[in-house]
């Protein structure tokens, strides 16, 4: 008898306890377990190790291989310290199942769906198995539509696809976390959606910092936890490879419930998708598989595909995924990032140079790309404006060496005009964020796509050539820039009168 897959893997019925196995071999996080003839568990079933004298060890494993001779090989989801040969193992009869639904918002979970934030148990009876098929082709929503973020540089130059996958590239300290939090905030306000954050194999300190910053910025509501906009799932660097390999699926399962049952638009963050591949490589070696190129697992593209194909738009709702991508040794041909790129619809590249200039979000307008930036999808007006913005910025980039050596005065009249407009565009691509209000003191701005296009058209047409470039820095729409220019002019006049 098998228990219902929507029952938590750790809750084992009395009947199920009869299907007991025993540990016969332990190699690090990998266990070999012998079961009675005819009682073999299925692949991906969760096994729970029983301690001596019925003490609970809280070690859950996942069946990966059926070895023959009534033995299975399983990978542990937590440390195997203290386990011994001969210990009893219970087959739960179902894959690892995790809590889903509104009660997960504002909480932090581990790979098994257990809360780790000391706020008590999760108030839900609804759970879902982490292993599921991707939606059938007939369920998919094939409409190509833009997912408006309210962030000017993203919406204009590298728009996100609803139900698409976006790669987020950036080093330390260039604003990845703030950009992630702003996206979480904006999807909640503009789309009535929720977010799920999957911390896969990254630093525990960063996970803690993110949680505290989310509380500070109101993304997680401390006074009323269910009013929060995000659920967090962590499987950090110190966890065994089994946990790091499966934590992405746990986060995705929670996101799928919001999409399929609540019919919401969901934002799924995975930080970092490379660590998912890395954990799979460790597990593969422990299971005795022959490695392929650069030591990666032979099943690399299958594992990546099984995760990525579940991230999609259906007729009920959408999951739009933003995945931080670490590129080992900056080698884009490495099998891990190369396999990831095959699934991405857009790339958002954060630039240290722009961050150093104080332009936030520090999204590089020339390096960031999107498959959605085509006239038949975004329309001629949007496409033309984006191309002209890129051409202006590219020309400015080409002229920077000449400016550095000879100065602005040596440029032609046309080039000087291009530089002036490019500098205004560069500053207008910055914008104040809601989640950064506590640091900047400036109220956050959500800028609609139509307003964004209108603003950049005004700069490119030369209408605003007379305004100072600082008027375009950290404003929302173009009307705010003209108002700021008037304020600057008035302040200048006042200071002149005082003199």
Swiss-Prot record:
Main location: plastid
Gene Ontology CC annotations of this record: chloroplast thylakoid membrane; mitochondrion; proton-transporting ATP synthase complex
Gene Ontology terms: biological process: proton motive force-driven mitochondrial ATP synthesis
Compartments it resides in: Plastid, Chloroplast thylakoid membrane
Binding positions (ATP): 170-177
Superkingdom classification of source: Eukaryota
Reactions this protein catalyses: ATP + H2O + 4 H(+)(in) = ADP + phosphate + 5 H(+)(out)
Coiled-coil intervals: none
Membrane topology qualifier: Peripheral membrane protein
Leader sequence residues: none
Record-linked PROSITE patterns: ATPASE_ALPHA_BETA (PS00152)
Pfam families: ATP-synt_ab, ATP-synt_ab_N, ATP-synt_VA_C
Molecular function via GO: ATP binding; ATP hydrolysis activity; proton-transporting ATP synthase activity, rotational mechanism
Enzyme class (EC, first level): translocase
Keywords of the record: ATP synthesis, ATP-binding, CF(1), Chloroplast, Hydrogen ion transport, Ion transport, Membrane, Nucleotide-binding, Plastid, Thylakoid, Translocase, Transport
EC code: 7.1.2.2
Subunit-structure text: F-type ATPases have 2 components, CF(1) - the catalytic core - and CF(0) - the membrane proton channel. CF(1) has five subunits: alpha(3), beta(3), gamma(1), delta(1), epsilon(1). CF(0) has four main subunits: a(1), b(1), b'(1) and c(9-12).
Family affiliation: Belongs to the ATPase alpha/beta chains family.
HAMAP family: ATP_synth_beta_bact (MF_01347)
Function (record text): Produces ATP from ADP in the presence of a proton gradient across the membrane. The catalytic sites are hosted primarily by the beta subunits.
The protein's name in its UniProt record: ATP synthase subunit beta, chloroplastic
Organism encoding this protein: Ipomoea purpurea (Common morning glory)
């Amino acid at each position: 008898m098998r228990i219902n897959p929507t029952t938590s893997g750790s809750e084992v019925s009395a009947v199920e306890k009869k299907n007991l196995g025993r540990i016969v071999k332990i190699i690090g996080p990998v266990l070999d377990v012998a079961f009675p003839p005819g009682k073999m568990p299925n692949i991906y079933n969760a096994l729970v190790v029983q301690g001596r004298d019925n003490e609970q060890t809280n070690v859950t494993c996942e069946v990966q291989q059926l070895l023959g001779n009534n033995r299975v090989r399983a990978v542990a989801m937590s440390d195997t310290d203290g386990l011994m040969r001969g210990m009893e193992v219970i087959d739960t009869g179902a894959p690892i199942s995790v809590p889903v639904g509104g009660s997960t918002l504002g909480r932090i979970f581990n790979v098994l769906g257990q809360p780790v934030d000391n706020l008590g148990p999760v108030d839900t009876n609804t759970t879902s198995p982490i292993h599921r098929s991707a939606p059938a082709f007939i369920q998919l929503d094939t409409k190509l539509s833009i997912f408006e973020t309210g962030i000017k540089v993203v919406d204009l130059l590298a728009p996100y696809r609803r139900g698409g996958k976006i790669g987020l590239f950036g080093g330390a300290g260039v604003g990845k976390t703030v950009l992630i939090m702003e996206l979480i905030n904006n999807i909640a306000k503009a789309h009535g959606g929720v977010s799920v954050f999957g911390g896969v194999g990254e630093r525990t300190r960063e996970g803690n910092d993110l949680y505290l910053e989310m509380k500070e910025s109101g993304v997680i509501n401390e006074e009323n936890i269910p009013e929060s906009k995000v659920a967090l799932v962590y499987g950090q660097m110190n966890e065994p490879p089994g946990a790091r390999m499966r934590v992405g699926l746990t986060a995705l399962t929670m996101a799928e419930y919001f999409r399929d049952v609540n019919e919401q638009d969901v934002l799924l963050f995975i930080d970092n998708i490379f660590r998912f591949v890395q954990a799979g490589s460790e597990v593969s070696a422990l299971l005795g598989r022959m490695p392929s190129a650069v030591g990666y697992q032979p099943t690399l593209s299958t594992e990546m595909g099984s995760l990525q194909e579940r991230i999609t738009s259906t007729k009920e709702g959408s999951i739009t995924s933003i995945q931080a991508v670490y590129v080992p040794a900056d080698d884009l041909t490495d099998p891990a990032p190369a396999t990831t790129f095959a699934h991405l619809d857009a790339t958002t590249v954060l630039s240290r140079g722009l961050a150093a200039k104080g332009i936030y979000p520090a999204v590089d307008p020339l390096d960031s790309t999107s498959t959605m930036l085509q006239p038949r999808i975004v329309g001629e007006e949007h496409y033309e404006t984006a191309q002209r913005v890129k051409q202006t910025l590219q020309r400015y980039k080409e002229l920077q060496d000449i400016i550095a050596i000879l100065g602005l005065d040596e440029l032609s009249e046309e080039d000087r005009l291009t530089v002036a407009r490019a500098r205004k565009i560069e500053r207008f691509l910055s914008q104040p964020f809601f989640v950064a209000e506590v640091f900047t003191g400036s109220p956050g701005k959500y800028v609609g796509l139509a307003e964004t296009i209108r603003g950049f058209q005004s700069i490119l047409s030369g209408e605003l050539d007379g305004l100072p470039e600082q008027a375009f820095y950290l404003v929302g729409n173009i009307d705010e820039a003209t108002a700021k220019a008037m304020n600057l002019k008035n302040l200048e006049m006042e200071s002149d009168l005082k003199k």
